[in-house]
């Protein structure tokens, strides 16, 4: 599933080609995504100029002069720029044609993504209750410490809760916990303030590094420019269960936490 760095990579790839451009037509070949694409999307968006492309959590917000297209890539979706008129292949559900001669094409083999229209996106039900962005000053270790008090759940699903902080998905939660030396199974409410301060720093560092590397290519992800991400080469623990730790050589262990695989080093993480 594309996580925050992959979505931010997509935003950075498509924004320069969309902002300031006028939409000439929207072609929807299949409306059956996680939620049906609005039947009047072509009418609402065609003829409008795109003002900006923003990201909130893992949602892309394509802001037009009036209204916003809210897009989510789901489990296997991607948005990329192609030449106008390029024939569509299987699973290529939507084309947003631009007067510049390019079009933004949405591909989603599993159809778990979304394309919705809103006149007030930040108050849309999908975005209204989201926590702070992890790379802003609104997120820090003190927030983690305060929100964790009295919580008996494991620390990994705690930091993956979008009400706590957005965009810390499975890959980056796994890597940040390793970097902070925290066992992902530890009870969230039992971790000290000092360790949460360290964890918040590592969450920011890991996410920033992943964005600079263009995200992590695992199975389906490609960026808005059609290029893969390279952060997979930097992974210390994610997807490496049973292999030796790159720091101490101890065999990494894999457990299930919140229905997700979690890999950790029993020596480096306490």
UniProtKB/Swiss-Prot annotation:
It catalyses: Hydrolysis of DNA containing ring-opened 7-methylguanine residues, releasing 2,6-diamino-4-hydroxy-5-(N-methyl)formamidopyrimidine; 2'-deoxyribonucleotide-(2'-deoxyribose 5'-phosphate)-2'-deoxyribonucleotide-DNA = a 3'-end 2'-deoxyribonucleotide-(2,3-dehydro-2,3-deoxyribose 5'-phosphate)-DNA + a 5'-end 5'-phospho-2'-deoxyribonucleoside-DNA + H(+). A zinc finger (FPG-type) spans 236-270. Pfam families: Fapy_DNA_glyco, H2TH, zf-FPG_IleRS. SMART domains: Fapy_DNA_glyco, H2TH. It comes from the Bacteria. DNA binds at residues 91, 110, 151. Disulfide bonds: none annotated. Its cofactor is Zn(2+). Keywords: DNA damage, DNA repair, DNA-binding, Glycosidase, Hydrolase, Lyase, Metal-binding, Multifunctional enzyme, Zinc, Zinc-finger. One of its GO terms (molecular function) is zinc ion binding. Binds 1 zinc ion per subunit. One of its GO terms (biological process) is base-excision repair. Its EC number is 3.2.2.23, 4.2.99.18. PROSITE patterns: FPG_CAT, ZF_FPG_1, ZF_FPG_2. The active site is at residues 2-3, 58, 260. Belongs to the FPG family. Involved in base excision repair of DNA damaged by oxidation or by mutagenic agents. Acts as a DNA glycosylase that recognizes and removes damaged bases. Has a preference for oxidized purines, such as 7,8-dihydro-8-oxoguanine (8-oxoG). Has AP (apurinic/apyrimidinic) lyase activity and introduces nicks in the DNA strand. Cleaves the DNA backbone by beta-delta elimination to generate a single-strand break at the site of the removed base with both 3'- and 5'-phosphates. Monomer. This is Formamidopyrimidine-DNA glycosylase. It comes from Pseudomonas putida (strain GB-1).
């Amino acid at each position: 599933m594309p996580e925050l760095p992959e979505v931010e990579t997509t935003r950075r790839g498509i924004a320069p080609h969309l902002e300031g451009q006028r939409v000439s037509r929207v072609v929807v070949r299949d409306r059956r995504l996680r939620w049906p694409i609005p039947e009047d999307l072509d009418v609402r968006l065609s003829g409008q100029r795109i003002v900006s492309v923003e990201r909130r959590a893992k949602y892309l917000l394509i802001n037009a002069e009036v209204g916003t297209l809210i897009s989510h890539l789901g489990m296997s979706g991607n948005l990329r720029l192609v030449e106008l008129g390029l024939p569509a292949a299987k699973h290529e559900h939507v084309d947003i044609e631009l007067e510049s001669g390019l079009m933004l094409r949405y591909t989603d083999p599993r159809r778990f993504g979304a394309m919705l229209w809103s006149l007030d996106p930040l108050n849309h039900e999908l975005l209204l209750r989201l926590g702070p962005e992890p790379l802003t000053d609104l997120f820090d270790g003190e927030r983690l410490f305060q929100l964790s008090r009295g919580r008996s759940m494991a620390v990994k699903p705690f930091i993956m809760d979008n009400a706590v902080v957005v965009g810390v998905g499975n890959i980056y939660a796994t890597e940040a916990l390793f970097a902070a030396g925290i066992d992902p199974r530890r009870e969230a409410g039992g971790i000290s303030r000092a360790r949460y301060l360290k964890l918040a720093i590592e969450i920011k560092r890991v996410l920033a590094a992943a964005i600079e590397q263009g995200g992590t290519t695992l199975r389906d992800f490609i960026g808005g420019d059609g290029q893969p991400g390279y952060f997979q080469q930097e992974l210390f623990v994610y997807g490496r269960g049973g292999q030796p730790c790159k720091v101490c050589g101890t065999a990494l262990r894999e457990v299930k936490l919140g229905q997700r695989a979690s890999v950790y080093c029993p020596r480096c993480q306490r």
